[in-house]
Amino acid sequence: MAYSFTEKKRIRKSFAKRATVHQVPFLLATQIQSYAQFLQEHASVAQRKSEGLQAAFNAIFPIVSHNGLARMEFVSYHLSNPPFDVKECQQRGLTFHSALRAKVRLIINDRENPTKVKEIKEQEVYMGEIPLMTSTGSFVINGTERVIVSQLHRSPGVFFEHDKGKTHSSGKLLFSARIIPYRGSWLDFEFDPKDILYFRVDRRRKMPVTILLKSIGLTPEQILAHFFVFDNFTLKSDGALMEFVPERLRGEVARFDISDKNGKVVVEKDKRINAKHIRDLDAAGTKLISVPEDYLLGRVLAKNIVDPDTGEVLANANDELTEGVLEKLRDAGVKEIQTLYTNDLDQGPYMSQTLRTDDTVDQTAARIAIYRMMRPGEPPTEDAVEALFQRLFYSEDSYDLSRVGRMKVNSRLNRSEGTGPMVLTDDDILDTIKLLVNLRNGKGEVDDIDHLGNRRVRCVGELAENQFRAGLSRVERAVKERLGQAETENLMPHDLINSKPISSAIREFFGSSQLSQFMDQTNPLSEVTHKRRISALGPGGLTRERAGFEVRDVHPTHYGRVCPIETPEGPNIGLINSLALYAQLNDYGFLETPYRKVENSKLTDQVDYLSAIEEGKYVVAQANATVDKDGNLVDELVSAREGSERETRMVTPDRVQYIDVAPSQIVSAAASLVPFLEHDDANRALMGANMQRQAVPCLRADKPLVGTGVERTVAVDSGTAVQATRGGLVDYVDANRVVIRVNDDEAVAGEVGVDIYNLIKYTRSNQNTNINQRPMVKVGDIVARGDVIADGASTDLGELALGQNMLVAFMPWNGYNFEDSILISERVVAEDRYTSIHIEELSVVARDTKLGPEEITRDISNLAEAQLARLDESGITYIGAEVEAGDVMVGKVTPKGETQLTPEEKLLRAIFGEKASDVKDTSLRVPSGMSGTVIDVQVFTREGVTRDKRAQSIIDEELKRYRLDLNDQLRIVEGDAFQRLERLLVGKVVNGGPKKLAKGTALTKEYLADLDKWHWFDIRPSDDDVATQLEAVKEAIEQKRHDFDLAFEEKRKKLTQGDELPPGVIKMVKVYLAVKRRLQPGDKMAGRHGNKGVVSKITPIEDMPYMADGTPADIVLNPLGVPSRMNVGQILETHLGWAARGLGERIGNMLKAQAKAAEMRKLLGQIYNESGKVEDLDSLSDAEVLELAENLKKGVPFATPVFDGAHEDEIRRMLDLAYPEDIAKEKGLTASKQQVTLFDGRTGEAFERPVTLGVMHMLKLHHLVDDKMHARSTGPYSLVTQQPLGGKAQFGGQRFGEMEVWALEAYGASYVLQEMLTVKSDDVNGRTKVYENIVKGEHSIDAGMPESFNVLVKEIRSLGIDIDLERN
């Protein structure tokens, strides 16, 4: 196999037993593809599908005026180039967007002859701004990066459910059905406890369902015919003959003697009719059965019965037969009647009963009843009733099932076709009611709401389309109003369309929707996870309070689609999920997961993506099924999931139809980074997966020695590590940029064959962590497409590295690791292993005030020169200045109002001029508790205001950097061109040229080398072809130079034009401070297995427990943290990490001894190729093997994939290989090599038993004590209670609560208590008095009345009770 440029520098030994058939799909694909489909930016107008923007335009246009004479049609749209790139938008606080312009056509018809077109106007109209997605799947809105989270909502369609017997006290199941459209009114059908079927629209008042059926044009006869089968009777003078239908009689109790046609009694009265009786009746050829009169009584008529002679209606459908009715029928000579067949088991009389409760007569009455329910209090006119009914379910403008909804409705109602109209049809309503009645009759199953076939994902594109459509429909209303005037006032399309509603709808969605979230940017993993998040909350979704257990629970259909592990702890548990590693969305928005096809118990290479519904039809085996080398399933029974419940059963191999593609397919990206996940308890695994997202990037990233192999995927897909977009030769490298000369076969003709990668240097992330990229290539390196050429934050050689590898000992140590505390060695702090850089952004704005403009200046009165030392002449701090809390960073003065001057001030004014008193100092100072180094300053100036020197120098610097890039491109382009020219010209005969080149001479390399390159174009070749090629190259180079000059001018224009600042702001300065945070007691740390703790003490190296060879441990953890938490994965990681460290030491020793490459290959072969995945070490050259060894000497990195990791015997083998007997003895290892005899650093004595020691990857989490530590002397007070505010952000005090008061009472500390409740809290006069006393040097307290008592008095008075304080 071929290794990439970075992979071969440090190969990760994998213990995976199964070859990968299917690569992990691009992790941000769902976001990026969804938005690309929304924009369809690069598709030609003709090729655009009806989705996204195109669909929204198609739905709203054409817009026709009220009089029908004018209409506006949509032709096409296009997006302009964004005015600023992503970086500029972040700096200036702008939105990274593109202007949307639509070409529309206004058609006006002739008034006299409305069919004739009078005029057509076509014009391009501005339709607002559409935010663009960055290459990493986020959006820049007002300068901050945001993510639009996908939403999991209930799919449109029809659903059947019951109340599980909770509604009625009898515990009877009440069935209901609901038709949910994508947009429009919901239609519910429900049974009540009396078995009458009702419907309701949009959760309003319920009405009998027969009203709805009548309103769609069915008569009572037709309704009964749809829902019942009929019994046919022929009336006789006494009793009747009933048509014999065997299956209707079976199981019934005979209410009379039943005889066959010969008069022989087959069933006696009161006997139950069984199968034998029916066979006997059948055998006798029975067609009719004679029934007595009382058998007819109480039956229900199926049809209206009309007197054949007079036409009079004798009885209506759904009337009960009584003796009177029968007599009437016999008198009129009616012979044949039909009644409804019902029974208590599977043919209930529900619709018949419902029809009885319904008092509407016909279709019109039914529609009026519906109108009155929807619009109570409005008089129903015929037109209004008709319009409302049409708009409810039949109008495409107000009702849309969507493609998904139609597909779901058809499949649930058992129809074969998958498409149909996007509105409801009469058949949909009728079939839904039929299915619901069948459910009540005990036929069929209800739906499972939490099945992923009934929930679909709405991605960015779809959410944005809905908002855009909402904005566009507001525009439509305005356009409709004005279209009437278009002809008379001779208006153009742009006069009619106002883009404001569209812009505001889009802006509101991206800026403040619940699904538009501030991107979690702590480290690369948190970015990726945030973009792969799926939320059930948000508009149109669930709410935390109403969501029950079922929705939050893991469902069998989550397998391979949604991660069962990664979800937040707390109120959102189960509502916010993460996409599984291999999952993707299908066209309908349902989650799919890949499975490998199995045919005749043999695995094929075909991989199919199945949705939850499709998967229900197949038998799917687990990825850990035993397979021989030819891909055959060998076990007699294989564990597999089958049926709609997806229960795991043991099946024979021949029944297996699919198999999982990988063992890690059920978990998400974060959970798949936890090694030995299979040995951790699920609750701890959840914490481990979640805490990795909070790991702060350390100063020097350190790859995990024990990983899972997914680290590289996450690092590369997150966009943190820079990948080469095309292969080529590295031409130039410095800390800021990498220049690559692209391979000829990858370069596109006519474009620059140069790729320049500008690296991100010391940039602030959303969470104030530092993003910094470092190049990993040297000049002359050859890279291929997709190779990692620069590391970012938390990546090491292109692999995710969230923490540091630490030598961990599991043992108690003087109580310092009680309750999960962590004891850490001073060496870790001294080596800056956990030091992180945080970048704080501080900004100051100079505004126009009523009293005059604020000014940014160095000239501030009343400040000592020492305080201004860090400011330049413009009043802005230097880059590189080290600042402490309270230091001035930007000098600013604000004019203050004229006040009455004291004589002294007047004197000062007279001597020193005006300036002294009319301004106050409002400079930007470093906030309390912060110190650091200034690393960047940005100055923004409003259009029309002259720039200060500092702002100008920043612009010059930026332009210089841009010019460098252009020069590099030009240098490489010209270099390539002249190389090609040289190959073209050498050896060609010429007609003449510079330096007196004679006609007929052939060109040589030497001649060309002596000649200035631009003079090559003066050579006159005798071959015309060569001459034209020469001319073409000259033109191409000149064109390139011209293009570059234009690009430079464009950039200069962009930088020198004024900045868009909020109204009233003249100038804005942003200062970026880099703050170094070392590890200290109180910081939170964690492993990857949910083993979290707080640093309790940093111990000198000499006091730490050490090994026989003198190596001290880095961290001491409490062994009691493991058994009850059941996260044994951390112990296995520790053992394997210990082996990794030992192997690294062996390799390091061989390098020191200058071992030959062949010996090195032998050891590497033992490490890599004895078990697990085989590595192709022979493909590496000797130099590459030695470079690999150099990178391995700190430890050989292992990959133990989730559910397919290293086994106990493999860990033992690695330990044996790492620590041969002599080394083991020297280090004091036990026979198993998993434990070590440690010595106490303070006494030098050995501890009484061996200790588990090894290497664990530990993270420092983003809960730093520096951000939480806070102290207050005086500060702000609450207005009403006059008590200090709370919290660090408000510079608040510590709450002294009820229980603390009890504690002081218990101790009898009365004076302390009085002080706490009065002067230290809300005794306003007492507070000032204490201050005065301290100033005077008296340390006494005069406690007065606490303000909260006054509040209490006021509150009691507000109840109308007069209460007063008696003062004596």
From Swiss-Prot:
Catalytically driven reaction(s): RNA(n) + a ribonucleoside 5'-triphosphate = RNA(n+1) + diphosphate
InterPro entries from the UniProt entry: DNA-dir_RNA_pol_bsu_ext_1_sf (IPR042107), DNA-dir_RNA_pol_bsu_external_1 (IPR019462), DNA-dir_RNA_pol_su2 (IPR015712), DNA-dir_RNAP_su2_dom (IPR007120), DNA-dir_RNAP_su2_hyb_sf (IPR037033), RNA_pol_bsu_bac (IPR010243), RNA_pol_bsu_CS (IPR007121), RNA_pol_bsu_protrusion (IPR007644)
Cellular component per GO, a single term: DNA-directed RNA polymerase complex
Enzyme Commission number: 2.7.7.6
A Pfam family it matches: RNA_pol_Rpb2_45
BP terms from Gene Ontology: DNA-templated transcription
Keywords tagged on the record: DNA-directed RNA polymerase, Nucleotidyltransferase, Transcription, Transferase
Gene3D superfamilies: 2.40.50.100, 2.40.50.150, 3.90.1100.10, 6.10.140.1670, DNA-directed RNA polymerase, beta subunit, external 1 domain, DNA-directed RNA polymerase, subunit 2, domain 6, RNA polymerase alpha subunit dimerisation domain, RNA polymerase Rpb2, domain 2
Family: Belongs to the RNA polymerase beta chain family.
Descriptive protein name: DNA-directed RNA polymerase subunit beta
